[in-house]
Curated annotation (Swiss-Prot):
Subcellular location: Secreted; Membrane
Keywords, ordered alphabetically: Antibiotic resistance, Hydrolase, Membrane, Secreted
Catalytic activity: a beta-lactam + H2O = a substituted beta-amino acid
Family that this chain belongs to: Belongs to the class-A beta-lactamase family.
Enzyme Commission number(s) from the entry: 3.5.2.6
GO molecular function terms listed in the Swiss-Prot or TrEMBL record: beta-lactamase activity
GO cellular component: extracellular region; membrane
Protein source organism: Streptomyces griseus
BP GO annotations: response to antibiotic
Note: The class A beta-lactamase family has a specific amino-acid numbering system, sometimes called Ambler or ABL numbering and often misspelt as Amber. A multiple sequence alignment was used to derive a consensus sequence and then the consensus was numbered taking into account insertions and deletions. This allows use of identical numbers, e.g. for active site residues, despite differences in protein length. UniProt always uses natural numbering of residues, hence there appear to be differences in numbering between this entry and some papers.
Main location: secreted
Protein name per its UniProtKB record: Beta-lactamase
Top-rank taxon, per record: Bacteria
Claim: Secreted is one of the keywords in the record: yes
Length: 13
């Protein structure tokens, strides 16, 4: 996911 800190375990690969 490209979203900032707030999402749970957002993986910006």
């Amino acid at each position: 996911a490209a979203a900032p800190d707030i999402p749970i375990a957002n993986v910006n690969a």
